[in-house]
Design a protein with these regions (language model features):
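Thiamine diphosphate
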Residues: 1-126, 189, 193, 200
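Flexible, low-complexity linker and terminal segments
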Residues: 1-4, 8, 13-14, 199-251
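Structural motif
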Residues: 43-46, 86-89, 114-118, 162, ...
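Glycine-rich beta-alpha junction loops
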Residues: 50-52, 122-124, 180, 208-216
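Short, hinge-like loop/turn segments at secondary-structure boundaries
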Residues: 62-65, 108, 133-137, 223-226
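Active-site-proximal loop->helix
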Residues: 102-107, 127-141
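Conserved thiamine diphosphate
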Residues: 133-200
Length: 251
């Protein structure tokens, strides 16, 4: 009998703690499948964030380290520079990467550190109960913006891919989503490419994954996916924002 689907070897047997309908499980699987297919499980080191994915070290069957809040890119930089033959990735949410960790993210990209960053953007602080994040949309209701995000007082959401793509340093900056089958497949390709770039020594790769948070958005999983399509993706368009290798090939 042909096997059409199975759990990736790069995932452990530990049950995921995420809320019902949370896409973190899908994204974990895509990362693990990329690790499996590239044959790098034995030399991969992951860096877990502070946030909903804080226990990622329980789920990935590779060496993992826990970073201080927002400091995953700096931690990954240290690991990669000390152990350049290892494949190093971070897995971070918007409350970690785009707020307290913004400096580490920007400067790792500017230096073109040869690391891979998986950035999950669900426009809210999930672990702490649904506060406004740097990526929360204008007018979005959260625990700390009960009348909706007012850009006059709170500023505009930060578009990480657009910002990082203006830097000279990074190799690959892309935004994907996991709200339907087509987007999941494309997300897998992007994540695998980000790891492949590191294997080839090309430098900094960041894959932003537009995700959902049904619990803190106050929606059913189905409604949350619909909201990703109707509200999140118009503000955070999927696509490749920088790919230096592709640009060179076109020339």
């Amino acid at each position: 009998m042909a096997v059409v689907f199975q759990k990736p070897k790069a995932l452990t047997d530990v049950p995921l703690h995420y809320c019902p309908g949370c896409p973190h499980g899908i994204i974990h699987r895509l990362v693990a499948e990329a690790i499996d297919e590239l044959g790098i499980e034995g030399k991969t080191i992951g860096v877990a964030p502070v946030g909903c994915a804080v226990m990622a070290y329980d789920y990935f069957a590779c060496d993992m380290i826990e970073a201080a809040h927002g400091r995953a890119p700096a931690t990954a930089t240290g690991i990669k520079r000390c152990r350049p033959d290892n494949i190093v990735f971070t897995y971070q949410g918007d409350g970690d990467l785009a707020s307290i960790g913004m400096a580490e993210t920007v400067h790792a990209a500017a230096r073109n550190e040869n690391i891979t960053i998986i950035f999950v953007n669900n426009a809210i602080y999930g672990m702490t109960g649904g506060q406004m994040a740097p990526t929360s949309l204008p007018g979005q209701v959260t625990q700390t913006s009960p009348y909706g995000r007012d850009v006059k007082h709170c500023g505009w959401p930060i578009k990480v891919c657009e910002m990082l793509s203006t830097l000279e340093g990074p190799e690959y900056i892309t935004r994907v989503a996991v709200n339907n089958v087509k987007n999941v497949k494309n997300a897998k390709k992007a994540i695998k490419k980000a790891f492949q770039n590191q294997i080839e020594g090309k430098g900094f790769s960041l894959v932003e994954v537009v995700s959902a948070c049904p619990t803190n958005w106050g929606m059913t999983p189905q409604k949350a996916l619909e909201w990703v399509e109707s509200d999140m993706l118009p503000y955070y368009p999927i696509g490749v924002y920088k790919d230096r290798s592709a640009a060179k090939e076109e020339k």
